[in-house]
Every structure is written in structure tokens, then in C-alpha cells.
Amino acid sequence: MCFAPSPMKPFHLLVFTLCAFGLFSGIVGAADSVNRAPPVPIIVGDWVHVYRPAADIFPGPDSPRFKTGERYPDWQVNDHAIIQGPDGRWHAFGITHPAVAKGEPNPHEAEWFLFHAAAPVGPLKQQWVAGRWLDQPKILPPAERRKEIREIHSPFIIPHDGQYWMFYGYSPIRYATSTDLWSWQPRGELFRQEGSARDPSVMHHDGLFYMSYTSRQSVLVRTSRDLLHWSEPTTVFSLAPGETGGAESPTLLALHGGFYLIWCRWDAELSKQLVTYQDRSFVYFSTDPLNFRDRAPIAEIQGHAPEFFQDEDGDWWISSAERPFRGVSIAPIKWKNKS
């Protein structure tokens, strides 16, 4: 996930503050936030299929199924980031590889580079048009990351200190930087997580960065003041004992006097039915960004690996990979109180 800054403005302008988004009038204290039901995200418009991957040449290296230099007509995507660049264009980056037919083994084979799609110059509402976002050259293939493992998953991008920082997994969590979103320089490893660490996402709040990520059946968070040195992890949420699957693609948002944790459910039973891209995402609320344990969801929202971001007018949007359409789709959302 990523926010939508004006070009290279300080990141503190993007922080989800209490006054920025038309919240409750006056100051909402922590106790009041607990007593009130917080607003929940509601999709209020159509899903528009803004990006469908075009046919492309597989850049390699060879995998069991895909061969370097061969052209494949159909590609699929997964976890992704959306951001507005200094060129006035909206960009999307994410997992990609040639499509795997339903029922074939290893539907995530060769996730070794990222797609890059870009819309024409103009505000997001003008780019909410089917097919408007077009493929650009793939980025960060293994040949450009020779000191890393081949896999590159779930990019998340924020502007910081005059650069765009991209975080990606799976473990070790690594990062790359860019000044323009077109040319990227891999910078290496940030940390490793015993077991697993994937799907990183970063929230900035009160001078502290919070990185949430998936590890097995839990969501973990680490904190940092400079994006380089990270604390030890805190487990902020876990699936109930006995549940199968996982809490994937987590996102933390600071809004409405507290914090939202949103994650996409991977249901192992659905996987047995060959449903690879599942689109049930769950919304949790807490006054403590490090504790969503033993809480019930306050809402469910459609979207696979959903990203939540704002446009130039401060309006909110959600994106989804592969559901309801191949590629990336976006829809407007509103934060509303439950009736």
C-alpha cells in the first residue's frame, strides 16, 4: 500500500491526523473513541479495471514453467502499491509473472520482479477509467539484485528524505530507493524474521514509523524513527487457535481517534477449491497500534491484497488485485458510521 503525496512533499503532510479527514468535531479522547463505534470503510462506487497486464517477454532466469526471452500473452498480479509521482502521474507496482492456469501447481511461480503501470498525467478521478493505466518495463529483476534472494513480493512505497522508499519481502525484508519512481536502486536487507515475514506496510504516526507484516498466522509490527533501524517485533494480531490460513497483506491506518488494522484472509479451505485470489478483507479498530489481539472485526470489505489511499482531493480509494478483474481495479470508499 502507499499514500498519494504531492510530489516529494514531507511525509508528515500525509500522516492520517485527526483533523485532516473530517472526523468528529473537537478532540476525541481515547476513552470516547472506545465508547463510540468508529466509522468503517464502505465501497461507494464501481470497481473500475484500470490496469490489465499486457503480453510481455519473461526476463528470466528460467523457472520450471517459464523460459527467459519467451513471450507470454497473459500475466497475473498480486500485492501491489499505488502512488502519485513527481511527474504528475499515478503509478502502480506489484508482484507479477506469466499467468498459471487454474488447477496447475505452484500458482506463484517466478515472482522475481515487479510490474510497473502508469496512468497519463492528471488527477486520479480522471484516471478512474478502464485500461487507462499501461504497462511500463518490469523493475528490479534478479539480475539487478544479485546480493538478494530472487523473490520480490508485496512492495510498499513512501516518500522520505527526498526519495521514494520501497519495502518488499519475503524475509529478509529489503528495500530500494528512487527519486522519480522510474529508476530503482536496491539497498539491501533491513531485517530477518524467524519463520516468515512478508507483505510489509508502513504507517507514520507521531514521529514513528510502524511496519506491519504477516508472519505465519499472525500480524507483527516493528517500529523505527529512520526506516533503517527497526525494533524487535510485537505480535499485534493472531488468528484464533485452530483456524487455518493466514492474515495477509496487513495495513495500519491512523484515523478517527485510533488505529485501523485491515488484512486479507487466506482461507486454506478455499485454496483446496483452487481459489487462489481471495477477496475477503477484515477491518479492526484499536486505540493502541500495537494491540489488536482478541478483538472482533468491525467490518468486512471486498478486495484481494487491498490498498487504501487518498487522491489529490483527500478522497479515499481502495484497490484490489485479480478480483474482480485480472490486474488491478480501484473503487471509491467512504468512512461511514454503521447504522
Model-found features: residue ranges?
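Bacterial N-terminal signal peptides
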Residues: L14-G26
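Bacterial N-terminal signal peptides that target proteins for export
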Residues: C2-F16
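Beta-rich carbohydrate-recognition and catalytic domains
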Residues: A31-S249, A254-H304, Q310-S339
